[in-house]
Amino acid sequence: MHEKLLTLCDCAFEARLIELEMRVSFQEQALTEISEALAETRLIGARNAELMRHLLEELGKVRNTLYEHPIDEPPPHY
């Protein structure tokens, strides 16, 4: 009887261990996916920052070209 009870406990512990191992495996996979998404988001952010810097530089060039001569400046609006 005592051996039978021990075997039932062993089975319950083994089932619980398997369940916990599956959960850890799932969490590791989720963490990997989140890490990859974060890395991709950082790359996109860096590209967007570079694009914004370039566009602001181009805008500055256009402004300089438009207002190169003071005569060409539009009158102030009040």
UniProtKB/Swiss-Prot annotation:
Pfam families: SlyX. It comes from the Bacteria. InterPro entries: SlyX (IPR007236). Belongs to the SlyX family. This is Protein SlyX homolog. It comes from Xylella fastidiosa (strain Temecula1 / ATCC 700964). The lineage of its organism: Bacteria, Pseudomonadati, Pseudomonadota, Gammaproteobacteria, Lysobacterales. The gene is slyX.
